[in-house]
Amino acid sequence: VHRRRAPNRSETPVLLPDQVNTILDGCSVQSPSGEWTGSEAGLRDRLFFAVLAETGMRIGEALSLRHNDFHITGGETPSILVAGRDDHPHGVRAKSGARRIYIGDDLVALYSEYVWQLIGWAADVAVADLASHFVFVNLARGQRYAPLRPETVYDKVDALTAAHADVLPQDWTPHWLRHTHATALLLSGVPEHVVMRRLGHADVQTTLSIYGWVTADAEMRTVAQWNSFVAGWKVSHDSTP
């Protein structure tokens, strides 16, 4: 992991692509037969961290997502609409205003697998209106299909860290995936104003004040194949919802 060099406190902690993949695979992997490994919550957890990595969302924004925020049909570029909600029962909220984030085919396929898993468990019967219900819900404990608590996410972070102590930093948090998203895009040559829009920043200066250092850091440019990491993402200049 690349950490800020003291005494400079302006650099953000970043996960390397291999570390992100360790997080995803540590949740669940798909077997050759198409089955997903791990617990019932494994696929949900993989989707959650994949959403953070590919979209740069904050944890509150991801936990606040509804199924009808995923726009993956109709022939248009697949996207997720991030709405400025504050109605999550566990107090998390989307800090930024509404924006549309375009996503790649792999994330679309992962989300679709998760939805089919929910339907296979009759979630569409148990929940009055699944389309408007929260995407990330309880599966392993608590009231089934109730909105997921942030504490559950952090419990998973702790479990992944313990299981992969040789790969993952001991102090990583879900927010590091947001930093990684921005870093990967900037080092892949994506314009700063596009990164700004995907992150939901009010102006490009905010983006530059947080992440401007990465483009001038020679080590960060060579420490990973950033272009390959973002190759499947759909990055668009149009962020209008």
Feature map (PLM): residue ranges:
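Flexible interdomain linker/hinge and immediately adjacent N-terminus
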Residues: 1-27, 139-144
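C-terminal catalytic core of Y-nucleophile DNA break-rejoin enzymes
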Residues: 9, 90-113, 133-157
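Short, basic (Lys/Arg/His-rich) helix/loop patches that form interaction surfaces
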Residues: 33-35, 143, 154-197, 201
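A short, glycine-centered helix-capping/turn motif at helix boundaries
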Residues: 51-64, 188-190, 201
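Catalytic-site neighborhood detector that most strongly recognizes the C-terminal catalytic loop/helix
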Residues: 199-225
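C-terminal secondary-structure termini that scaffold catalytic or DNA-interacting sites
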Residues: 226-241
